[in-house]
């Protein structure tokens, strides 16, 4: 049948409509600066095939982990014709896969990492640094297929890396499961602004400024790389300059110098790099590959395109003899030889050892009749020529047991850093040792307060002289450090009373000190009066104070509500708190408290949405939370901006009613273009002041639509109930023990 048809009246030809859903010019094309609220609505049930009742933690507990590991050990040496194993062992490939899955983590915002299995989705599945890792995941498919829902891709990729190390003679520190797979690309992660892969720092929209200052929160030197350019900064083969890049990038994913040396030297003990021929032979990445390739990319026309003809990074060769065995070979070779700079067959800068002894020659990965000199990348040589790395590397060389322990611990940290507290760890191989980077909190070792105690403590808190804004602000400050990205922060531990949080400007240290002293007095009086060991922690009391204040504010508005509260938080010690590690949680802006530390190139409302996403909020939750915080009078420094009510400390929908009032006109102030005055349209009399954060709920069409829901005459009760629900959510974001 022809796709053309004629109208029986006019005789004109009309083409059949072709579905073009999702195509065409988008809102983002028309208005590039439009606020990106889509990051608040990711990973919904509509993209998840597992169903609403699926509980991954429960499924993982049914897994025979030992059996999975045996299957992984077996596949390591089961070389497949379609992608032959180097030296008959896939260990090096799977270590690289696990490393690159975890290595996207950056501690600046906690995003990236191995926690969601995103290496199998765009853009990571097609990054230049992940060339041919698609093959590693296909090698794992029979095992994933066998165990199905009991193990996620995210867990399997990390476990495969562990098993690769173990199968080659290394004793790992442990393994924890619990990573749940994502089913759609993560839209909230900022990977950089460059518009070409591997763009160097002299290209437009560079991530570098000044004296090679890397843009925050990025932790990789070029678009599409995990860490550094192995050839050197911007491809310049300078080992000392490369050391600076290595230090900066590894530090940004929470590794110190000793951990960095251990990771590089330990990881490069295994496997090889692949650069058998020019990159012009390599086809498109998975996302751009033809449909018949079925999700595989980088098809190569060089020779067989695999085995000894493989092209991945462009660098060619192995670092040491016996690349499928754990030993001290990497560090021995690194310091034993002098190195000459050469170009690989693919044209990449690398270094070959000079005057190599026969015992250090490396047998070909796919042709045992051939032997090759050891290779080092420019980044590898930074371990020898960087003045800080060099003595660490030599110490490891002279102390093999220390080196093995350092690598085991660093590898565990690399692959588990974004999982959050130990309470999320699953499986029989979870290490018993508590590590400071896990942000530990004491176990509950006492009887918890009951409903009667909770009611009594609320009365005492509200009678203490502390105001609603003080109690709400303190509870918010304690709980809102949580990041859904790496599951750090939150109210558990009461670290708001410790450095660095007690001194953060956003937390108003003087006010905070007053509130904490008062709450500590209530805590001590309660605990001292108990027989039998019942106690209340300060962490619980801080949250309870906020809940009591919200209840009182709702009561002031005529609503009798009970804010949910579950005790069980404990108080961390200074010894359990890494000050430097917690410093990255300090907010540069908190729109919920109308706070901004300085002026930034990023608009205030964008910072609000970013923070809301880290708090796992939806757009409606963000909206009702801001509206409630304003009428509760919780602004930083007590500023009146956005407090659109004549009855503060009363939980009403006044913020929305007055923001949406057409009787008010808004203009930026002469002193600050980001502060606005709202004047009576008829008289010109000043009514309100507000920030960009406040006004965006009337300006942005999507947020205004939500604000209108809460601004209606019949929405008072809904507003209070919704605010209480999201408040409770924030207070419990880190309570993984309640799941």
Swiss-Prot record:
Pfam families the record matches: peroxidase
Keyword Membrane (UniProt): no
Gene3D superfamilies: 1.10.520.10, Peroxidase, domain 2
Subunit structure, as described in the record: Homodimer or homotetramer.
NCBIfam families named among the record's database cross-references: cat_per_HPI (TIGR00198), PRK15061.1 (NF011635)
Entries under CDD domains matching the protein: catalase_peroxidase_1, catalase_peroxidase_2
Keyword Heme belongs to the record: yes
Catalytically driven reaction(s): H2O2 + AH2 = A + 2 H2O; 2 H2O2 = O2 + 2 H2O
Protein's name according to its UniProt entry: Catalase-peroxidase
Description of post-translational modifications: Formation of the three residue Trp-Tyr-Met cross-link is important for the catalase, but not the peroxidase activity of the enzyme.
InterPro entries (UniProt xref): Catalase_peroxidase, Haem_peroxidase, Haem_peroxidase_sf, Peroxidases_AS, Peroxidases_heam-ligand_BS
Major enzyme class: oxidoreductase
EC number: 1.11.1.21
Protein family according to the UniProt entry: Belongs to the peroxidase family. Peroxidase/catalase subfamily.
Active-site residue numbers: 100 (proton acceptor)
GO BP of this protein: cellular response to hydrogen peroxide; hydrogen peroxide catabolic process
């Amino acid at each position: 049948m022809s796709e053309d048809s004629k109208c029986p009246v006019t005789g004109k030809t009309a083409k059949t409509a072709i579905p073009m859903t999702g195509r065409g010019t988008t809102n983002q094309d028309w208005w590039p600066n439009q606020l990106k609220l889509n990051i608040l609505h990711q990973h919904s049930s509509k993209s998840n095939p597992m169903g609403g009742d699926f509980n991954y933690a429960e499924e993982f507990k049914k897994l025979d982990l030992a059996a999975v590991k045996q299957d992984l050990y077996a596949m390591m040496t089961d070389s497949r014709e379609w992608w032959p194993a180097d030296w008959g062992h896939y260990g090096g490939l799977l270590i690289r896969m696990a490393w690159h899955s975890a290595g996207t983590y950056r501690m600046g915002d906690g995003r990236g990492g191995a926690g969601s299995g995103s290496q199998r989705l765009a853009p990571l599945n097609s990054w230049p640094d992940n060339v041919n890792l698609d093959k590693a995941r296909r090698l794992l498919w029979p095992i994933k297929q066998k165990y199905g829902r009991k193990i996620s891709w995210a867990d399997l990729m990390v476990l495969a890396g562990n098993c690769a190390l173990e199968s080659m003679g290394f004793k790992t520190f442990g393994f924890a499961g619990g990573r749940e797979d994502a089913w759609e690309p993560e839209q909230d992660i900022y990977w950089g602004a460059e518009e070409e892969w591997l763009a160097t720092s002299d290209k437009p929209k560079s991530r570098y400024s000044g004296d090679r200052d890397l843009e925050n929160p990025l932790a990789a030197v070029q678009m599409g790389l995990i860490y550094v350019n192995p050839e050197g900064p911007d491809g310049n083969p300078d080992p000392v300059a490369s050391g600076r890049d290595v230090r900066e990038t590894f530090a940004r994913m929470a590794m110190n110098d000793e951990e960095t040396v251990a990771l590089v030297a330990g990881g490069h003990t295994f496997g090889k790099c692949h650069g058998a021929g020019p990159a012009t032979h390599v086809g498109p990445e998975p996302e751009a590959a033809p449909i018949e390739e079925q999700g595989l990319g980088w098809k190569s026309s060089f020779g067989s395109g695999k085995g000894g003809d493989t092209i991945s990074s462009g660098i060619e060769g192995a670092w040491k003899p016996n690349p499928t065995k754990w030993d001290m070979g990497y560090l021995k070779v690194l310091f034993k030889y002098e190195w000459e700079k050469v170009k690989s067959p693919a044209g990449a800068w690398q270094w070959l050892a000079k005057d190599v002894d026969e015992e250090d020659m490396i047998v070909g990965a796919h042709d045992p009749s051939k032997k090759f000199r050891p290779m080092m990348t420019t980044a590898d040589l930074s371990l020898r020529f960087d003045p800080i790395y060099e003595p660490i590397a030599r110490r490891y060389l002279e102390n093999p047991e220390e080196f093995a322990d350092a690598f085991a611990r660093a590898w565990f940290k690399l692959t588990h850093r974004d999982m959050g507290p130990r309470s999320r760890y699953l499986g029989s191989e979870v290490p018993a040792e508590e590590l400071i980077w896990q942000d530990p909190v004491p176990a509950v070792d006492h009887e918890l307060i009951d409903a009667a105690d909770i009611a009594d403590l609320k009365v005492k808190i509200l009678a203490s002289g502390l105001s609603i804004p003080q109690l709400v602000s303190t509870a918010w400050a304690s709980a809102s450090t949580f990041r859904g990205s790496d599951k750090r922060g939150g109210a558990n531990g009461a670290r708001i009373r410790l450095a660095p949080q007690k001194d953060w400007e956003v937390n108003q240290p003087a006010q905070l000190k007053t509130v904490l002293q008062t709450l500590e007095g209530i805590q001590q009086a309660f605990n001292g009066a108990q027989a039998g060991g019942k106690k209340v922690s300060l962490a619980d009391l801080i949250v309870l104070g906020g809940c009591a204040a919200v209840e009182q504010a709702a009561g002031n508005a005529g609503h009798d509500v009970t804010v949910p509260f579950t005790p069980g938080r404990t108080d961390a010690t200074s010894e359990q708190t890494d000050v430097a590690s917690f410093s990255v949680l300090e907010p540069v802006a908190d729109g919920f408290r109308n706070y901004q530390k300085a002026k930034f190139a990023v608009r205030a409302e964008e910072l609000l949405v970013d923070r809301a996403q880290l708090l796992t909020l939806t757009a409606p939750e963000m909206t009702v939370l801001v509206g409630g915080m304003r009428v509760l009078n919780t602004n930083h420094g007590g500023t009146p901006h956005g407090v659109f009510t004549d009855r503060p400390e009363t939980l009403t929908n006044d913020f929305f009613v007055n923001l949406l009032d057409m009787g008010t006109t808004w203009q930026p102030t002469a002193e600050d273009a980001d502060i606005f005055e709202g004047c009576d349209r008829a008289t010109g009399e000043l009514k309100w002041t507000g920030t960009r954060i406040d006004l965006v709920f009337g300006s942005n069409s999507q947020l205004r639509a939500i604000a209108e829901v809460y601004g209606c005459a019949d929405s008072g009760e809904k507003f209070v109930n919704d605010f209480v629900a999201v408040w409770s959510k924030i207070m419990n974001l880190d309570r993984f023990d309640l799941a």
